[in-house]
Amino acid sequence: MPSPKAVERIAIVTHNHEPRVADAVARVERLAEAKGVEVTGEDGRPDLAVTLGGDGSMLRAFHRFLGTDVPVIGVNFGRVGFLTSMVANELETGLERAFVGDVTVVRFPTLDVRIGGQNRPAVNDVFATSSRLGRMVELGYSVGGEDLGVLPCDGVICATPLGSTAYNLSNGGPVLVWGLDAMVITFVAPHSLHVRPLVVPHMRDLCVTNKTPDGSVTVIVDGQEAGRLEPGEPVEVGLGAQTGMLATLPERTFFTRYRKAFAS
């Protein structure tokens, strides 16, 4: 894990315009001024990105700072907040600690999605499903160049460790602990008793081909449509070269979050 350091500059990232979030922005700015920390824009080479919002805001911040070695720490103003490190009433005490480097920084892998001759990064997950609501699709798939067959299903999810606790988990996929350099492949409602999720390491890319004779497949990357596959067209997904960085208070470990969100 990268060694944390004292913070000189921060960027405040929020996509929520509620009054309580606007008030939180002012609180962060006052705290930063009191501690001699400069508040800069997202392009101002910050040492830390402070995100005010939920997991969706965290994902957008991760995308913004991918490959920059800028860690992202979150204050939860959303619902679940699995990726955030503190709630609103902990903002001052938590950020005071972050400003002096009292955080743990976790580096996490991303996905490289290749569709239609273009590459896109995914922080959370990739989902391929029918372009027509409620329709089953037939997907051919291979891992590491080895053909694994054609499967009728409602779709397939490929998730990072960071994204494994989202849609993947809801569909019976395993949770990947932070720190693993792997991705998980989980089918949605497969018409087979023998298909199980797969945990795949680096250099074992997933290739999914639309084998549905009369329908297209929509590919969704981190909740945004990335393209469509006509019959016979593929999408390839593998672990990417870019990494993201999550800053967290040391006691807010992965298993602390897991126990609170899923095991209690």
Identify the function of each model-found stretch.
Residues 15, 50, 76, 126, ...:
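A residue-level signal for conserved active-site and pocket-lining positions in enzyme catalytic cores
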Residues 150-194:
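Gly/Ser/Thr-rich active-site loops/lids in small-molecule metabolic enzymes
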Residues 1-48, 52, 60, 64, ...:
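ATP/NTP phosphate-donor binding region
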Residues 120, 128, 133, 144-147, ...:
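ATP/nucleoside-binding phosphotransfer catalytic cores, i.e., glycine-rich phosphate-binding loops
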Residues 80-155:
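Catalytic core of DAGKc-family lipid kinases
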Residues 17, 54-57, 80, 162-164:
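Short glycine-rich anion-binding loops that position phosphate/pyrophosphate groups of nucleotides
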Residues 69-71:
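Proline-centered loop/turn at the N-terminus of a beta-strand
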Residues 56-62, 165-170:
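Short glycine/serine/threonine-rich phosphate/pyrophosphate-binding segments
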